[in-house]
From Swiss-Prot:
It comes from the Eukaryota. This is NADH-ubiquinone oxidoreductase chain 2. The gene is NAD2. InterPro entries: ND/Mrp_TM. It catalyses: a ubiquinone + NADH + 5 H(+)(in) = a ubiquinol + NAD(+) + 4 H(+)(out). Keywords: Electron transport, Membrane, Mitochondrion, Mitochondrion inner membrane, NAD, Respiratory chain, Translocase, Transmembrane, Transmembrane helix, Transport, Ubiquinone. It is found in: Mitochondrion inner membrane.
Length: 428
């Protein structure tokens, strides 16, 4: 990926007029190569794991699936932002490179390299637009603090085990017991920040509110997807903290259900919506239900990217009111309706089945209290999404309906994914 990044950078600097096309085609070519490797892995009768660089890098079918999903998100974002300068596409590919290193790393030090590469690219992407300085600074300072916690956690793990390799760490964790509690807490704090879980969620509404929708399509998808897909790899480092993680996830979706009612700005509403959904996702991880976990990640990321792509088509002033113009644009209006109903987790849309799997996971292990909390939070959140639909389609349009450019390939692909849960049930 680094060679591709360097080659693409030279091409974009030479023909910066076609930077968007060059970056998209380069990333598409890399996606096709990874897809071919994934198909080769899938054709084997036995599960195969490849190690490179003396065990620093690990590659298997599940990691390849995660990489393909990350690259798919990057392709959608790049296709939507093809008119931006070559600097944006360079940083976007740099962020994807960091995510790839983070997911394939089998050593904490190499993971940190990918983690920081992704962070640095995100900082610079957020600073590209005028007016985003405050949001970028808030995210930068908060991220710097929690990155320090991550480095402290790694230093403690190394001091206790004498290694940063995952294999050695996983073996030593079985013998150290409570001695690793402090580094696990530090690691959990960093994860909570990156995902916006309570109590490390305060940056999310402020940063979302200060960014344009184009940048939110990156901020709300790739960095969070990278962390979510990385969590199963390091689960042995967090096995003692599963109850804490479950409590944080429950607090997140409960807080989201309560505070969504007080939001009159679209982006802050979306921020608290993200906090709630990520709480549900992490709850599935905390109870060890990887089936529900992977399914929810897939549905949530597709729906999130779809809503940002759609909302970025609207005039960005008083966005909560501007959605009412969608009733004059039937294609976008239908897309908006499907996306919101998916985020509200109403049947027969795919978001309902994702949340239902988490509910069944709670019931199977006897966590009835958490199941009740999930139902109550889901019902309360769904009411706010339905109110959003009511405002959009049944209120008076406050502004003249402006012409909106519809990207039909993106719209159709998102609708097929979200409106046909029967096809997604094949994944169950």
């Amino acid at each position: 990926m680094l060679y591709l990044l360097l080659t693409t950078t030279l091409l974009m600097m030479t023909w910066n007029r076609y930077a968007g096309r060059i970056a998209f085609l380069s990333l598409l070519g890399y996606f096709v190569i990874m897809l071919n490797i994934w198909l080769h892995f899938g054709s084997l009768s036995e599960s195969v794991t490849l190690l490179f660089g003396g065990g620093l890098v690990r590659l298997d079918e599940s990691i390849l699936s995660a990489l393909l999903f990350i690259l798919f998100l990057g392709l959608v974002i790049m296709n939507r932002t093809g008119d931006l300068g070559w600097e944006f596409h360079l940083l976007l590919m740099g962020g994807l490179t960091g995510a790839i290193y983070m997911l394939t790393a089998y050593d904490l030090l190499l993971m940190v390299v990918g983690f920081e590469f992704l962070n640095l690219s995100t900082y610079l992407i957020l600073s590209l637009y005028r007016g985003t300085e405050t949001a970028t600074l808030k995210y930068l300072l908060s991220s710097a603090f929690y990155t320090t916690l991550l480095l402290l956690a790694i230093s403690f793990f190394y001091g206790l085990t004498g290694s940063t390799g995952y294999d050695a760490l996983f073996v030593q964790m079985n013998y150290l017991g409570g001695e690793t509690f402090l580094p696990q807490i530090l690691l959990l704090g960093t994860i909570a920040f990156k995902l916006g879980l309570v109590p490390a969620h305060l940056w999310v509404p402020d940063v979302y509110d200060g960014l344009p929708m184009t940048l939110l399509s990156w901020m709300g998808s790739v960095p969070k997807a990278a962390v979510l897909l990385w969590l199963p790899t390091i689960y042995p480092l967090l096995n003692q903290l599963a109850p804490f993680l479950l409590v944080l996830s429950a607090l997140s979706f409960l807080l989201s259900a309560v505070l969504m009612a007080a939001q009159y700005k679209m982006k802050r509403f979306l921020a608290y919506s993200a906090i709630g959904h990520l709480g549900f996702v992490v709850a599935a991880f905390a109870i060890g239900d990887y089936h529900a976990y992977g399914y929810y990640i897939f549905i949530y990321m597709i729906a999130t990217l779809a809503q940002f792509v759609l909302l970025s088509e609207l005039p960005q002033t008083e966005l909560m009111k501007q959605t009412s113009v969608l009733k004059d644009h039937r294609a976008l209006g239908l897309g908006f309706l499907v996306i919101v109903l998916t985020m509200a987790s109403l049947p027969p849309f795919a978001g309902f089945y994702a949340k239902l799997l988490v509910l069944f996971g709670f019931l199977e292990i006897g966590y009835g209290i958490f199941a009740v909390l999930l139902i109550l939070a889901s019902l309360r959140s769904a009411a706010y999404y339905l109110k959003w639909i009511q405002t959009t389609f049944f209120s008076v349009v406050p502004f003249a309906s402006a012409p909106i450019q519809v990207q039909y390939p993106n719209l159709v692909s998102f609708l097929v994914t979200l409106i046909l849960p029967s096809t997604l049930l094949l994944l169950l």
